């Protein structure tokens, strides 16, 4: 799940750079949505990992 969070975060950052650079105005809103989704997914996966107490082997 953490891999998906990182993927969405990278996509959001790229879309944000393109949008704020003036290349695509619509990508600003897309970047905001994807960024917040990535933050929520990161927090959820962090909490689940802490609650389960998983250790990596």
From Swiss-Prot:
GO terms for cellular component: plasma membrane. Its main location: membrane. InterPro entries: DUF1328. Signal peptide: none annotated. It is found in: Cell membrane. The keyword Aminoacyl-tRNA synthetase does not apply. The keyword Hydrolase does not apply. Keywords: Cell membrane, Membrane, Transmembrane, Transmembrane helix. Pfam families: DUF1328. It is a multi-pass membrane protein. The chain crosses the membrane at residues 4-24, 30-50. NCBIfam families: PRK13682.1-3 (NF010228), PRK13682.1-4 (NF010229). Belongs to the UPF0391 family. This is UPF0391 membrane protein RPB_2024. It comes from Rhodopseudomonas palustris (strain HaA2). The lineage of its organism: Bacteria, Pseudomonadati, Pseudomonadota, Alphaproteobacteria, Hyphomicrobiales.
């Amino acid at each position: 799940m953490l891999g998906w969070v990182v993927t969405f975060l990278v996509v959001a950052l790229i879309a944000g750079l393109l949008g704020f650079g003036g290349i695509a105005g619509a990508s600003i809103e897309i970047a905001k949505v994807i960024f917040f989704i990535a933050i929520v997914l990161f927090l959820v996966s962090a909490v689940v990992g802490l609650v389960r107490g998983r250790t990596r082997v």
